[in-house]
From Swiss-Prot:
Region (Disordered) location: 1-144, 167-225
SUPFAM superfamilies in the record: EF-hand, WD40 repeat-like
Gene name of the encoded protein: CFAP251
Main location: cytoplasm
Name of the protein this chain belongs to: Cilia- and flagella-associated protein 251
Basic and acidic residues bias: start-end ranges: 1-19, 31-59, 70-95, 201-220
First and last residues of every WD repeat: 341-383, 391-431, 442-481, 499-534, 537-597, 601-641, 647-684, 694-730, 737-780, 791-831, 837-883, 889-927, 965-1005, 1025-1065
Annotated source species: Pongo abelii (Sumatran orangutan)
Biased composition (Polar residues): 118-128, 172-182
Main function: Involved in spermatozoa motility. May also regulate cilium motility through its role in the assembly of the axonemal radial spokes.
InterPro entries membership: EF-hand-dom_pair, WD40/YVTN_repeat-like_dom_sf, WD40_repeat_dom_sf, WD40_rpt, WD_repeat_EMAP
Skewed-composition ranges (Acidic residues): 60-69
Biased composition (Low complexity): 99-111
Disulfide bonds: none
């Protein structure tokens, strides 16, 4: 069954029209068998024998079973009689011409039939990554037959009335998007109380063959009853309570979202349901959150790869629509009862701009979207039909401004209104004409001779002939809708609107305009909420709540309870003074606070207050389940992340934005760095100042804070490339923090600031790493007031820049620093000598690693099995240690599409936390290491995972060439012209390695070659004390894959070099003059001698044979004989250099950094 609401069974007639029939009660003879294994037997005889045994058992059951059978027979007769009566009634209605029918276009039927007949689905296909679908084939029949004639007849009769099991073919689109909702394409009624779940699945049944084989019906029904399979989908059979039931299934991902702190206060929050549980809907980054306030549970609607830009809900709160902005943008419709995505629109914006505004009709049949492109498009979607194209589309002129709000007429789903800040547009949809007409009168100050103000929101007036548009000047523009009289024979034109009057409601700007029951409701920038009747007369208001600017108002779908003697509804402000009876509602404010107002007694409850600005700083307590979250708005909040309980917070004075947070190793202190350079040391349990005054030794944002292992030192780094150190001293018998010294030690931004311990003592050591490729050690013992001593400086990279640094866990006898760089590499440096001991391919998920931490061990048994948690630009991931380049040892998931600002790991290693920066959220991820280990096991052993990194794999052309070059290097090292017996071995000398590397397309620099030599030579030195001077083919393959650029030679890297070295020529391209090009080769970087340069050009221009330099028998052209002025053009561009001079085949992958 598809995961959607089931519609009542339809009787299909020859003319292609359908009549809706009421859903029948299930027959009591449908009951589950006690031995479900019988359904899996394919042997017909064995199946029949089991049926005989069950029948004999049933005869011995007693009088109760006999009575049930008699009742079943009676129900069967009643069902048959009802069917006959309804068939007669339908014929009478059809004859009298009073039957309301929905027409299916012949072309649509034909196309759908062809699709159903030709497409075959795979039995293992998965829908939406959640529920597997069984194999469906309309021509395949099950061989199981019934022997009991009475049961056979009963099932045959029921199969014509009950909803049939969806075992027919479905299109791949239905599989992929799990969209079981169907409607005929004919015009639907404008006013209807029937919800879409009464129509879902209708189109597929309309397109079914009239006469399905009775044998298949019997077989389907029988298998369904025997196996206990529900005849209803999960979406149609669920209740509201199922969403928050605990999922006991085993996790299937290494990282699973368990909680999201914060919310996107620029989007609305909706009141989903209230009866037994208070449930809200809001957005965090790219995830929609369904939050149960009473249970303190969250359910996450995950499916978007970009930040969600808008969302809406149906009037009954059953259906949720979300949309995003960015590449491959999606529109997803969800079932709020189950959390299942019932339909996905993949190509809503082919240009990739995303959706700016969205609305759903009150009956939830149609969805309207407005794109966020420069030329906006208004589209109306019949989403219940699971179509991939809109029913109609309208492009808006750019002079209308950016339309950022849209809503349907609640009583006519063919009318809409939208507005930008300066223009309101009325739409009328003519479905039969495939036309979306619009009217957008120009409104200026001269229209009413008064200042109108900028529009905020618009709604349809309760009197059905007017539209209201609210402005930021506290006014309402009233528009009259002029509809031409309806005529069956002639078309009298499209409707249009005209500005009628300007009503000055209040002084405060109106930010929210909506309707509920018989009231028009406004919310303003001062936090006031006011209610007006249809004449725009004030009825009541809430002005004493002391709220921020109103961002959203969402009223409960449950009507207000009638007043009783115990009720405490306030009186309205009319002369009669009637009780102001109103639904409860949710209030969302621009300062990221959400409130619930119980109108009976006017009880305001604060549900949560979250940071209203970017969240860049998070830190986990070292031995308690606490997380501190800091925001640019100056708020620090501390949560217990085990029970999801907010504990305490502190809001600093205006202008102090929290940029960095770190607990000290004892967990007693919390260091906080601020955007304007201030450093606070706070008590971790109260957030009160530990020092009398904060430290102010920087003028720029403090980006890093770190404590030494004994909490005697604290170091900070800021955006002016400066490292500052603070020290704990004893003054007058009290321990106080004092400033020690600071030093601008880097030329570019500091990426890591790390304390460690010296191997020969327990003294702390301090290291800093910058994008200037410098690793700097500081001498804390020799430092004194205002003088921070530098111990040593080392270069970490040549072309790429380092991104982060962490102490490598003690998995080996050697102590390492693990440094990640912008070239997707992970490097291990000896902690003492700073020699690069190993270079490895790190996780490559679209951007380099930006931060990483070693996952704390959970037990002593796990000391030899360690893991890294890392973040890159938009993802969080896990990496199994030791890193060896195996791509199956890592996994990542999108956590914040617009960028990750920070990361933290719980003290027990169970959770990772990511801060989303400007998306104002922090996500908690549960770590399941067993899933990642399973992926490694499935990826293969030894070299199997590495073969997948080669073009063509183990049997491909590239690997064959690599083998040829490897063994050819043995011949060359022994001499090409030697007459002695060849000694073929499994190894080559290290001196041959650079030549083989270059022969297969990897051109390492001299520094990289030295790193490769050191890596191989000292690979076993610590364990054996011996140096290695040769390498075999498997080890060579690993070295090659770990050292080469992960995406090959890219034009982006060459273009970046020309951006730095070149000038802009007459064609607008970066170029280098020939003289400058030759001068750079012999003077900059790993410069050549002039002879080496000329020899290289001779080889590149084909003047020297291959292998000339190492094969004495070959003759070569002397470099002095080459005339470079003739061979090289006057100016050299990146394309000329790559293709004409070097002769490279360049990859089009140009989005990687550091290549």
């Amino acid at each position: 069954m598809s995961d959607a609401e089931e519609a009542p069974r339809e009787a299909t007639r020859e003319n292609g029209e359908t009549e809706m029939k009421e859903e029948e009660e299930p027959n009591p003879n449908y009951k589950e068998v006690e031995d479900p294994q019988q359904e899996s037997k394919d042997d017909t005889l064995a199946w029949r024998e089991s049926q005989e045994e069950e029948r004999k058992t049933g005869e011995e059951e007693g009088e109760e079973e006999e009575e049930k059978e008699e009742e079943g027979k009676k129900d069967k007769k009643i069902v048959m009689e009802e069917t006959e009566e309804k068939a007669g009634e339908s014929q009478e209605k059809e004859a009298s011409g009073i039957q309301e029918e929905t027409t299916v276009e012949p072309q649509e039927v034909t196309e759908s039939m062809i699709r159903l007949e030709t497409q075959i689905t795979d039995s293992q296909s998965v829908t939406s990554g959640i529920f597997p679908k069984t194999q469906r084939g309309s021509k395949s029949k099950l061989s199981l037959q019934l022997e009991d004639a009475e049961t056979d007849e009963l099932l045959r009769d029921l199969s014509t009335q009950l909803e049939f099991l969806d075992l027919d073919q479905i299109s791949p689109e239905e599989q992929q998007i799990s969209s079981p909702e169907r409607q005929p394409s004919g015009e639907l009624e404008e006013k209807t109380d029937q919800m879409p779940q009464d129509e879902l699945g209708q189109e597929r049944r309309d397109l079914e063959p009239e006469n399905r084989e009775e044998g298949q019906e019997r077989t389907v029904s029988d298998i369904q009853s025997k196996a206990g399979i529900s005849r209803e989908s999960l979406v149609s059979s669920t209740t509201e309570d199922i969403l928050f039931q605990k999922d006991k299934s085993a996790p299937v991902y290494p990282l699973t979202m368990t909680w999201s702190f914060g919310w996107n206060s620029s989007l609305p929050v909706y009141y989903i349901r209230e009866e037994k549980q208070r449930v809200l809907l809001y957005v965090c980054a790219h995830t929609a959150i369904i939050y149960n306030v009473f249970r303190n549970n969250q359910y996450h609607l995950q499916g978007h790869a970009n930040i969600i830009s808008c969302l809406c809900v149906s009037e009954d709160r059953r259906w949720i629509a979300t949309a995003d902005k960015g590449p491959d943008c999606l529109v997803i419709i969800w079932d709020s009862f189950t959390g299942i995505p019932v339909h996905t629109i993949f190509d809503s914006c082919p240009e990739g701009s995303g959706i700016r505004a969205m609305a759903m009709t009150h009956d939830a049949k149609y969805l309207a979207t407005i794109s966020d492109a420069e030329v906006q498009k208004v589209c109306i979607w019949k989403w219940t039909l699971a179509v991939e194209t809109p029913a109609c589309t309208l492009e808006l002129p750019t002079e209308y401004g950016v339309q950022n709000y849209v809503t349907f007429n609640p009583t006519n789903n063919k009318e809409l209104v939208s507005n930008s800040k300066t223009w309101a547009i009325y739409y009328a949809w003519y479905e039969e004409r495939d036309t979306l007409a619009h009217s957008a009168p120009l409104l200026t100050e001269k229209t009413f001779n008064k200042l109108v103000g900028k529009f905020s929101q618009s709604v349809f007036h309760l009197n059905l002939t007017q539209i209201l548009s609210a402005t930021m000047e506290g006014k309402l523009v009233v528009w009259d809708i002029h509809r031409p009289p309806s005529s069956a024979s002639t078309f009298l034109g499209f409707p249009y609107i005209k500005p009628c009057k300007l009503v000055h409601l209040q002084k405060e700007g109106i930010t929210v305009l909506t309707t509920t029951d018989s009231y028009i409701v406004t919310g303003d920038i001062k936090g006031n909420i006011k209610f007006y009747d249809h004449t725009l007369s004030i009825v009541n208001w809430y002005s004493h709540l002391k709220l921020g600017a109103i961002r959203t108002l969402s009223f409960s779908k449950t009507p207000a309870t009638p007043p009783t003697e115990k009720s405490n509804y306030p009186p309205d402000c009319t002369l009669k003074g009637d009780l102001f009876v109103l639904r409860n509602f949710i209030i969302g404010t621009s300062d990221a606070a959400v409130y619930h107002l119980t109108t009976d007694g006017t009880k305001l409850e604060k549900l949560f207050v979250e940071p209203k600005d970017a969240i860049c700083a998070i830190s986990c307590h070292p031995y308690q389940p606490l997380i501190a979250i800091g925001s640019i708005c100056g708020m620090i909040k501390v949560w217990n992340y085990e029970n999801k309980q907010y504990l305490f917070s502190r809001v600093f004075e205006k202008g102090l934005g929290v940029q960095s947070l770190t607990y000290n190793p004892e967990g007693a202190l919390l260091g906080a760095g601020f955007t304007e350079g201030t450093v606070y040391i706070l008590d971790a349990m109260s957030l009160e100042n530990e020092s009398p005054e904060p430290f102010k030794y920087s003028r720029t944002s403090v980006t890093h804070i770190s404590f030494s292992h004994d909490s005697q030192y604290m170091a900070t780094a800021d955006r002016s490339f400066t490292v500052a150190v603070y020290m704990l001293v004893v003054r007058n018998g009290q321990r106080v923090w004092e400033y020690l010294a600071r030093l601008r030690s880097h030329r570019k931004s500091i990426r890591s600031l790390l304390f460690g311990v010296y191997l020969d003592s327990n003294e702390p050591r301090l290291l800093s790493l910058g994008t200037d490729r410098l690793l700097i050690g500081y001498d804390l013992l020799r430092s004194y007031k205002d003088c921070l001593e530098v111990l040593d400086i080392h270069h970490t990279d040549q072309g790429c820049y380092p991104t982060c640094m962490v102490w490598y866990p003690p998995l080996t006898r050697e102590l390492f620093l693990l440094i990640c760089n912008s070239g997707y590499k992970v490097k291990l440096f000896n902690a003492t000598t700073k020699m690069c001991r190993k270079t490895l391919l790190g996780p490559a998920y679209g951007s380099p690693i930006e931060q990483t931490q070693v996952l704390p061990v959970r037990s002593m048994a796990e000391l030899q099995k360690r893991y890294l948690v890392f973040i890159n630009r938009d993802k969080v991931g896990l990496q199994i240690l030791p890193v060896d380049g195996n791509p199956h040892k890592t996994s990542a998931i999108v956590c914040h599409p617009n960028g990750v600002a920070g990361m933290a790991v719980s003290y027990d290693g169970h959770y990772a936390f990511t801060a989303g920066g400007h998306d104002r959220s922090v996500v908690q991820w549960k770590i399941t290491l067993s899933v990642l280990e399973a992926a490694v096991s499935l990826g293969g052993e030894d070299l199997t995972p590495f073969y997948g990194l080669l073009s063509g794999g183990r049997e491909g052309k590239f690997y064959r060439e690599l083998e040829d070059y490897f063994y050819y290097s043995q011949l060359r090292s022994q001499g090409i012209d030697t007459m002695e017996t060849r000694k073929v071995s499994e190894h080559i000398c290290l001196s041959e390695l650079p030549f083989v590397m270059r022969a297969i397309g990897f051109y390492p620099s001299e520094e990289k070659i030295d790193d490769i030599f050191n890596e191989i030579k000292f690979g076993e030195y610590v364990d054996t004390g011996k140096l290695i001077d040769k390498i075999n083919l498997p080890d060579f393959l690993k070295v090659y894959l770990n050292h080469k650029p992960p995406f090959g030679n890219t034009m982006s890297g060459i273009h970046k070099s020309f951006e730095v070295l070149g000038y802009t020529n007459s064609k607008g391209k970066k170029a280098i003059r020939r003289e400058d090009f030759l001068r750079l080769l012999v003077t900059k970087g790993e410069h050549m001698t002039e002879e080496e340069m000329l020899d290289c050009f001779a080889s590149l221009f084909g003047l020297n044979p291959e292998g000339w330099k190492s094969e004495p028998a070959t003759s070569s052209v002397k470099g002095s004989e080459i005339c470079l002025e003739e061979e090289l053009p006057d100016e050299i561009t990146a394309e000329i250099f790559a293709t004409e001079i070097l002769g490279l085949t360049i990859s089009e992958y140009s989005s990687q950094d550091g290549q």
